[in-house]
């Protein structure tokens, strides 16, 4: 799948689930299940409830996503 086909959205972590999964509420109000991308897992980026994150979605399954970036709170 090409990078141009992925949908990128902003979301907020609602709940931390088992197995590295998260429940994320997107900016349009939809709640999806997401997992952490490989580079974030390797670099041990901690994600907590309330964090704002970037999520990539596949156009084929809009109920699951991949967390690609955690925004710093300023």
From Swiss-Prot:
One Pfam match, by short name? Answer: eIF-1a
- Output the SMART domains linked to this UniProt entry: S1 (SM00316)
MF (Gene Ontology):
ribosome binding; rRNA binding; translation initiation factor activity
- InterPro entries annotated for this entry? NA-bd_OB-fold, RNA-binding_domain_S1_IF1, S1_domain, TIF_IF1
Transferase: is it a keyword of this entry? no
Ranges of residues in domain S1-like: 1-72
Signal peptide location in the record? Answer: none
Record keywords, A-Z: Cytoplasm, Initiation factor, Protein biosynthesis, RNA-binding, rRNA-binding
Q: Does the keyword RNA-binding apply?
A: yes
Q: What PROSITE patterns does this protein's entry cite?
A: S1_IF1_TYPE
- Cellular component aspect of the GO annotation: cytosol
Intracellular or extracellular location(s): Cytoplasm
The main place the protein resides is cytoplasm
The record's CDD domains line, in alphabetical order, gives: S1_IF1
The record's listing under HAMAP family reads: IF_1 (MF_00075)
**Quaternary arrangement and interactors, per the entry?**
Component of the 30S ribosomal translation pre-initiation complex which assembles on the 30S ribosome in the order IF-2 and IF-3, IF-1 and N-formylmethionyl-tRNA(fMet); mRNA recruitment can occur at any time during PIC assembly.
Q: Which family does it belong to?
A: Belongs to the IF-1 family.
Q: State the protein's purpose.
A: One of the essential components for the initiation of protein synthesis. Stabilizes the binding of IF-2 and IF-3 on the 30S subunit to which N-formylmethionyl-tRNA(fMet) subsequently binds. Helps modulate mRNA selection, yielding the 30S pre-initiation complex (PIC). Upon addition of the 50S ribosomal subunit IF-1, IF-2 and IF-3 are released leaving the mature 70S translation initiation complex.
Official protein name in the record: Translation initiation factor IF-1
Q: Which organism is it from?
A: Ureaplasma parvum serovar 3 (strain ATCC 700970)
């Amino acid at each position: 799948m090409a990078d141009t086909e992925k949908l990128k959205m902003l979301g907020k972590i609602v709940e931390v689930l088992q197995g590295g999964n998260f429940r994320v509420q997107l900016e349009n109000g939809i709640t999806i299940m997401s997992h952490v991308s490989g580079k974030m897992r390797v670099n041990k980026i901690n994600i907590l409830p309330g964090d704002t994150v970037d999520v990539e979605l596949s156009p084929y399954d809009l109920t699951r996503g991949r967390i690609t970036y955690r925004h710093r709170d300023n």
